[in-house]
């Protein structure tokens, strides 16, 4: 081999090419040795050089400072233009973004140039540009500037990071850079999952694509061209050709010979020769046009890229394709800047003047230009044709510049330009059609004031951004906000001024009397905001009850009086006027801190008292205060005893104290009438709301039993009251029986089914019976048994039939039971069919019957009919109106009554399984309000006048919030457990009071803004005072905090009540010596406008006063509104700083560039129709339909389907390829083609014709073409593009589809259709556990097939030649497995004798 010298710089790309060349010429073994030597050489030189990175190696280019200064200056100019209303918020934003992006890119180039000019051996430069470590982007951040970052929503933050890591970041820059860093981490985490799922879907759709044959014989193919992005080639033709097979022969005219033949595979050398002969449209074979059924042939696929030779038969190319596309998914990074799409990632191509000179336009251009507005809000000219312009320095020197169509010119004819000055920009209109998306930007007000429209024409219409879209005129207009202070007053407040009035600081702007409607006794609370959290709560908030009963009213302390006499501007005020009261006398109070304690207390200590478990769970269990530590379960102390006397019931005992996060519940009992009332503090009650229950044992049973109604009428079941409301009284019949539920196989039973046991018999190890009776053991479910003891007498009747007729019947007193037995009381008869073992007999002394039975059963089994005579308990249920209720005292107005409501807990015939007492009827006490109106009933606890009614002893005495709390219990301090003894002496009375009241709650910040005005509420009445209807109780006043002129909003209505006061800070006065400008009152002037020689406006505004020597201007702020913008305000509206004024609508380009990361790839592969509930413009389905419609006119239905599918296939391949290429990811075209083939292989039937197909059915294109050949009336169909998910679910193998998604649906559908799975793919065979038909398994499959043919030959069968011919005719190769039956000849075979 001759040595030769190659004079090139060895960098990453060059090494790659060199190694590829070496492999091709010298093979793998020698290449391995060469690469090893290359590595050693590299390490040796790196060691000698001692390349390391130090801080001094990070050299910042000196040009950075003036580049940033230029950018700052440009942005300040843009900001001034925006403040003047010359450009919109969108244009300002885009200008700022573009300026900083351009600066950052320029600085990047400066960094590279600086290294080249100063130190080419700089370690940073060598590492980054050799490709060893790092890249230019990271170098830029180290020594240039970090640039723009995006926020979590993907919008660019228009504040760039000017510093680099060498200089160090400021705090603000660091926080902004954290946005991007965090976004990067989150994106990486999410993208990994997305990429994995994408790979799974791709594998599923293509797993059955295997190389099954050598040549499908197709003459079709696709044309390959270099892939370009604008003028830049991103995928060269040579690269695209390597590994392909030619579909046509290539002839060189110059050399007069064929360079390559059809069906020849293309190597790298051959690719170079072909491109030299033919630059474009090289016709190659492709998986897209392969005729092999459900597979790809060797020649259409081409090389296996791993080996550089034709792919082997049995290669699972579908899996390889899926992995090749899915794996780089994680590399599709989101850009560090710009995911919101203000610009397209690349700065538009700019044209700058090469020399100083004067610009000359050709004459033809004068009529071929239109005025346009650039995206930065600048006026410019747009060329409609390709043109050349001339820049001339002098007569001798000139330069001609070629400008393509749709170039934006920033210069005019005859204008002088400097060298490097920007003169034009190539517009994106000349690029291929890009999909655009609609974006919006909200503009908010910078100051308080009034909205003013200037040349803004509105038009209402419905649109995508809501039902009302306000559209401005064609050229937009200005929206001004005129400065002023805003007062927002409550609707009910009468104002004390008019528009044009001058108001001073501290004057009353509005006031309102607060009057009572009904009159009554006053009760006032006032407290500071967040007073619940304060420790000194009782000094700030006073709770006083009305003086309606004779009790000691507490003296109002100094704080209260001071608060009443002064303004309550920092306090909330709660005023209640009671106008109806109903008082229950002689009520005793017991306090508990949990429902469980109360239940135990009632059950164990006070058998004749019954507690309502929950008056209203939503009210009684809610938490009113801050959360504290979880309260432990406590139990009533055993020293709580019951003592009875003539006057009532008194209790001495310990009770646990509630923590601050619990609502207290009070148990009220009346000493004369056995009523027990339970409610939460401050409870509001409604009409018919139950507040108490009758305490009685009258309806309490000893155990469970059967319920029967006699003459009782009830309503339907009430789930809230948990019972049936009694409409008409009657008698409730109760047949007692004792029921125990036991877990089977875990507990030993001491009794058997059919036993008759005495009272006190041991049933279980720790359970004895309460009654004597017949034992019945039944099975409720697989786990539990039920033991039922039915009290009663056993009797064996002489006539079994007569007894059976009396089964489950009542027998009244004096009536015959059976065999002459007469009932002494009401009994219930039940026939027992099972054997009864008993020594019990009917005795003559028995209360149930009068006569005795002479012969009795004793210790013997009776297999005949046995009668069980069961006792019945009768309960009288009166009508509701006849139930006695506790007496009460009516006060003031007699508007409240109490009424009783009865609820039966169980329905007629219901069996209650229990061994504990059961309450059958609940008698409740309810409120009966005679008047409804805007009034609420409330319950109050009033202590009767007496000395110390309640004595307490406790560890901590804490401040209380309610007077009766202090009398009843001690609040806990600092969350300590406090136990206190509560003692109610006999004869000490409390009144239980229900009242109707008006509630007036006044918040200190209820109707005004505290920074502009002050709210004062003055009380005109005192606590406990009786007021008549329409009396004033308090007065609200609004005090102004600013002086100035009142300018009422033009749109101020009764609903708004907003006013504007213009004070001194809202206007400026300028002196005018000589006003050359014609100024008028009301003129709107822009910032920096000249209003007189040498006098510039410091701020934009409106002239409100004009004199000969001075002008007063009201400060204002203009906002330019573009067309199609949605306005959120109207002319004359009052707005605050930060309020939204307008939503600007604009279009932004969506390039092939992967600005959204993986979603763009997914959008293409899933063939999405919509994005974010909006139709996706120019989507694949619309594009295919349009192509099919055009082709159908030209070629007819059948050819049009194939033609339009081919077009969409090429579009898809190129789109997906360009997306990956934009990220520097190289994927061979053939992998994408394999996947796209699966997406575009089916059509949807429109009309079935003579076929058996139904409209809407999906079928493969080649199958319907074959079917149509054999019918007279063809089926009509149209092409369809399926996303990879849908294609996976519509595959022929139901096992593969079911293992992917929607398992139940797929299997159900397959079962209904009676589908057969021929196990052709890899996935199905893996699931079944067979050898897969690919790789070595493919050859095994072929071997089995040939062996089968030999066996048939040996058996005397030969292949039928007619069948062989028919088989060859069919284009669709049939790969289905043939399952042979033993008793018949397989299809296509016949006996040798027959063949002869």
From Swiss-Prot:
Cofactor binding note of this UniProt entry: Binds 1 Zn(2+) ion per subunit.
Localisation: Plastid, Chloroplast
Pfam family membership, one: RNA_pol_Rpb1_4
Binding site for Zn(2+): 216, 290, 297, 300
Residues annotated as transmembrane: none
This protein's record includes keyword Phosphoprotein: no
Gene Ontology CC, one term: mitochondrion
Enzyme class: transferase
Tree of life domain: Eukaryota
Keywords recorded for this protein, A-Z: Chloroplast, DNA-directed RNA polymerase, Metal-binding, Nucleotidyltransferase, Plastid, Transcription, Transferase, Zinc
The protein's role, per its UniProt record: DNA-dependent RNA polymerase catalyzes the transcription of DNA into RNA using the four ribonucleoside triphosphates as substrates.
Quaternary organization: In plastids the minimal PEP RNA polymerase catalytic core is composed of four subunits: alpha, beta, beta', and beta''. When a (nuclear-encoded) sigma factor is associated with the core the holoenzyme is formed, which can initiate transcription.
Family: Belongs to the RNA polymerase beta' chain family. RpoC2 subfamily.
Protein name: DNA-directed RNA polymerase subunit beta''
């Amino acid at each position: 081999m001759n040595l030769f010298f190659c004079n090139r710089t060895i960098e990453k790309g060059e090494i790659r090419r060199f190694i590829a060349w070496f492999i091709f010429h010298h093979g793998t073994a020698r290449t391995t040795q060469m690469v090893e030597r290359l590595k050693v050489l590299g390490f040796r030189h790196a060691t000698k050089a001692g390349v390391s990175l130090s801080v001094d190696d990070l050299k910042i280019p000196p040009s950075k400072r003036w580049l940033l200064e230029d950018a700052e200056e440009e942005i300040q100019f843009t900001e001034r233009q925006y403040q003047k209303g010359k450009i919109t918020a969108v244009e300002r934003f885009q200008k700022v973004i573009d300026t900083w992006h351009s600066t950052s890119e320029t600085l990047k180039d400066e960094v590279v140039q600086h290294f080249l000019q100063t130190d080419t051996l700089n370690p940073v430069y060598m590492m980054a540009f050799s490709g060893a470590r790092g890249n230019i982007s990271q170098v830029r951040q180290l020594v240039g500037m970090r640039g723009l970052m995006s926020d979590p929503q993907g919008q660019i933050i228009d504040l760039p990071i000017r510093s680099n890591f060498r200089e160090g970041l400021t705090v603000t820059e660091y926080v902004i850079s954290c946005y991007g860093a965090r976004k990067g981490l989150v994106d990486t985490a999410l993208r990994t999952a997305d990429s994995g799922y994408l790979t799974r879907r791709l594998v599923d759709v293509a797993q059955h694509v295997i190389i099954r044959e050598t040549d499908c014989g197709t003459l079709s193919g696709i044309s390959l061209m270099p892939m370009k992005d604008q003028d830049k080639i991103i995928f060269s033709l040579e690269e695209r050709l390597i590994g392909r097979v030619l579909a046509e022969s290539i002839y060189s005219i110059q050399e007069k010979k064929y360079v390559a033949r059809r069906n020849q595979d293309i190597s790298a050398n051959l690719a170079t020769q072909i491109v030299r002969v033919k630059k474009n449209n090289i016709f190659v074979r492709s998986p897209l046009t392969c005729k092999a059924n459900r597979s790809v042939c060797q020649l259409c696929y081409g090389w296996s890229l791993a080996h550089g030779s034709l792919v082997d038969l049995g290669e699972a190319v579908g899996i390889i394709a899926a992995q090749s596309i899915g794996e780089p998914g994680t590399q599709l990074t989101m850009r560090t800047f710009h995911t919101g799409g203000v610009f397209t990632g690349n700065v538009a191509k700019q044209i700058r003047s090469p020399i100083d000179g004067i610009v000359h336009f050709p004459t033809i251009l004068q009529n071929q230009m239109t005025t346009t507005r650039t995206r930065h809000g600048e006026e410019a000219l747009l060329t409609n044709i390709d043109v050349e312009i001339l820049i001339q320095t002098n007569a001798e020197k000139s330069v001609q510049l070629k400008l393509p169509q749709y170039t934006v010119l920033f210069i005019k004819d005859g204008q002088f330009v400097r060298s490097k000055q920007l003169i034009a920009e190539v517009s994106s209109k000349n690029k291929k059609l890009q999909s655009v998306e609609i974006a919006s930007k909200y503009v908010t007000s910078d100051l308080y004031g009034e909205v003013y429209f200037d040349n803004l024409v509105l038009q209402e219409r419905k649109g995508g951004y809501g039902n009302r879209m306000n559209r401005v005129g064609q050229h937009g207009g200005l929206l001004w906000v005129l400065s002023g202070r805003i007062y927002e007053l409550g609707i009910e407040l009468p104002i004390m001024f008019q528009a044009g009035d001058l108001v001073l600081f501290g004057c009353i702007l509005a006031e309102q009397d607060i009057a009572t409607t009904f009159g009554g006794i006053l009760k006032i609370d006032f407290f500071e905001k967040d007073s619940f959290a304060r420790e000194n709560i009782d000094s700030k908030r006073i709770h006083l009850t009305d003086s309606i009963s004779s009790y000691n009213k507490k003296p109002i302390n100094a704080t209260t009086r001071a608060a009443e006499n002064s303004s309550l501007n920092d306090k909330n005020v709660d005023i209640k006027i009671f106008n109806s009261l109903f008082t229950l006398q002689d009520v005793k109070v017991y306090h508990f801190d949990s429902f469980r304690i109360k239940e135990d207390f009632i059950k164990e200590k006070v058998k004749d008292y019954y507690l309502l478990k929950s008056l209203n769970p939503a009210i009684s269990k809610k938490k009113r205060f801050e959360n504290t530590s979880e309260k432990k379960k406590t139990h009533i102390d055993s020293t709580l005893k019951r003592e009875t006397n003539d006057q009532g019931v008194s209790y001495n005992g310990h009770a646990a104290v509630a923590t601050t996060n619990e609502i207290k519940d009070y148990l009220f009992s009346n000493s004369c009438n056995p009523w027990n009332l339970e409610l939460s503090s401050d409870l509001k009650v409604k009409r018919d709301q139950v507040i108490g229950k009758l305490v009685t044992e009258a309806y309490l049973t000893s155990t469970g039993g059967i319920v029967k109604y006699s003459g009782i009428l009830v309503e339907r079941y009430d789930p809230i009251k948990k019972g049936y409301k009694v409409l008409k009284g009657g008698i409730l019949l109760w047949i007692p029986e004792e029921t125990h539920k036991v877990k089977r196989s875990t507990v030993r039973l001491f009794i058997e089914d059919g036993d008759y046991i005495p009272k006190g018999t041991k049933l279980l190890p720790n359970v004895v019976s309460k009654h004597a009776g017949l034992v019945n053991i039944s099975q409720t479910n697989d786990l539990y048994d039920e033991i039922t003891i039915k009290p009663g007498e056993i009797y064996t009747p002489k006539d079994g039939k007569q007894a059976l007729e009396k089964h489950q019947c009542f027998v009244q007193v004096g009536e015959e039971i059976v065999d002459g037995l007469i009932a002494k009381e009401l009994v219930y008869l039940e026939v027992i069919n099972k054997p009864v073992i008993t020594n019990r007999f009917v005795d003559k002394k028995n209360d149930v019957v009068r006569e005795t039975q002479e012969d009795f059963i004793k210790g013997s089994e009776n297999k005949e009919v046995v009668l069980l005579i069961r006792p019945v308990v009768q309960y009288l249920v009166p009508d509701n109106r006849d139930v006695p209720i506790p007496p009460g005292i009516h006060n003031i107005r007699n508007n409240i009554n109490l009424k009783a409501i009865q609820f039966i807990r169980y329905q007629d015939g219901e069996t209650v399984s229990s061994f504990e007492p059961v309450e059958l009827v609940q008698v409740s006490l309810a409120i009966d309000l005679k008047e409804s109106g805007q009034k609420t009933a409330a319950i109050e606890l009033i202590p009767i006048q007496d000395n110390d009614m309640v004595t307490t002893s406790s560890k901590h005495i804490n401040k209380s919030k309610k007077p009766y709390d202090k009398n009843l219990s001690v609040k806990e301090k600092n969350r300590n457990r406090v136990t206190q003894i509560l003692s109610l002496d006999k004869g000490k009375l409390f009144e239980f009071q229900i009242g109707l009241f008006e509630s007036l709650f006044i918040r200190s910040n209820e109707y005004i803004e505290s920074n502009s005005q002050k709210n004062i509420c003055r009380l005109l009445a005192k606590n406990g005072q009786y007021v008549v209807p329409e009396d004033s109780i308090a007065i609200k006043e609004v005090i102004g905090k600013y002086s100035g002129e009142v300018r009422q909003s033009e749109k101020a209505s009764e609903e708004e009540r907003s006013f504007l006061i213009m004070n001194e800070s809202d206007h400026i006065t300028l002196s005018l010596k000589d006003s050359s400008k014609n100024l008028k009152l009301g003129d709107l002037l822009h910032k920096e406008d000249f209003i007189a020689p040498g006098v510039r406006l410091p701020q934009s505004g409106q002239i409100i006063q004009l004199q000969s020597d001075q002008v007063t201007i009201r400060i204002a702020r203009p906002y330019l509104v573009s067309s199609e913008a949605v306005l959120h305000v109207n002319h004359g509206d009052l707005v605050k700083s930060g309020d939204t004024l307008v939503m600007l609508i604009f279009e932004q380009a969506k390039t092939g560039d992967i600005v959204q990361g993986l979603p763009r790839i997914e959008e293409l592969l899933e063939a999405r129709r919509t994005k974010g509930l909006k139709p996706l413009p120019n989507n694949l389905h619309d594009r295919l339909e349009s192509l099919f419609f055009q082709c159908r006119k030209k070629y007819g239905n059948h050819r049009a389907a194939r033609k339009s599918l081919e077009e969409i296939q090429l579009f898809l391949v190129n789109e997906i390829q360009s997306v990956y290429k934009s990220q520097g990811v190289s994927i061979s075209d053939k992998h994408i083609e394999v996947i796209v083939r699966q997406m575009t292989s089916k059509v949807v039937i429109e009309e079935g014709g003579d076929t058996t197909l139904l409209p809407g059915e999906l079928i493969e294109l080649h199958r319907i073409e074959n079917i149509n050949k054999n019918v007279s009336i063809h089926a009509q169909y149209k092409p369809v593009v399926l996303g990879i998910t849908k294609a996976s679910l519509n595959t022929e193998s139901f096992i593969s589809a079911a293992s992917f998604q929607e398992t139940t649906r797929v299997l159900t559908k397959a079962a209904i259709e009676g589908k057969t799975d021929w196990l052709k793919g890899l996935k199905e065979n893996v699931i079944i556990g067979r050898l897969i038909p690919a790789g070595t398994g493919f050859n095994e499959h072929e071997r089995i097939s040939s062996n089968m043919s030999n066996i048939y030959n040996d058996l005397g069968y030969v292949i039928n030649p007619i069948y062989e011919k028919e088989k060859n005719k069919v284009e669709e190769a049939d790969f289905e497995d043939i399952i042979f039956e033993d008793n018949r000849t397989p299809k296509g075979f016949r006996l040798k004798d027959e063949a002869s």
